[in-house]
Amino acid sequence: EIYTLSLHDALPISSLLRKRLSGKESKRQQLAALLILVGSGLGLLASFVLSIESLTLAKNSHAVLNCDLNAAMSCSTVANHWSAAPLGFPNSFIGMMTLPVMVTIAVALLAGAKFPKWFMWGAQLGAVAGLLFAGWMFYMSYVEIGALCPWCLTLDAGMLLIFYGLTRHNVLNKIIEHRGLRRFVDQGYDTLVLASVAALVIMAILAKFGSQII
């Protein structure tokens, strides 16, 4: 006996597939928002600690900080360099002002809030600026200063997660409408880029400071 699938039979199947796809998409968006929250939390914690340490150094520039582990890992060495305060105040103060906004956005997204495109584009540009600034600070520490700050590295990791999570969320929600980027995210290449950047940074640190930190 031959059975044929009628339009009436196909509708429930189509509806089920849409629900499954919608559920999968929702989970991806929630994960992206969670990564924004984790990155913002790490960055805010690092900014808070660095702000306290900058006040300690303001009182005594020769103070030994808790994260002064050795010559290679020294917060005070980095903090006493001009690049730690190019605007006239510690860079960590910028994090204290901006990262609570990212925390709020992440919590709101996890709760199901929807923001207008202009707002999310503003957040995206902020994440790009933050990542570029973090990259510049890492370059200065790695090349110019010749020492690394553990809490600065924590802040860098947080900014990388914020940029990754926010970009992924905006692409999935069509805030950033670009077919190429959508395919890039759907195929997981953005995750590969994130892992590659993290691996390259770790290898660069080990190549230069490995003997001093291991």
Regions found by a protein language model. Give the residues of each.
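Extracytosolic (periplasmic/ER-lumenal) interhelical loops and adjacent juxtamembrane/interface segments
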Residues: 55-90
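Hydrophobic alpha-helical transmembrane segments
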Residues: 89-112, 129, 133
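N-terminal signal-anchor transmembrane alpha helix
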Residues: 31-58
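Juxtamembrane boundary at the C-terminal end of a transmembrane helix
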Residues: 203-214
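Membrane-interface helix caps and helix-loop-helix hairpins in membrane proteins
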Residues: 138-150
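Single conserved hydrophobic/aromatic residue that forms the stacking wall/gate
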Residues: 1-9
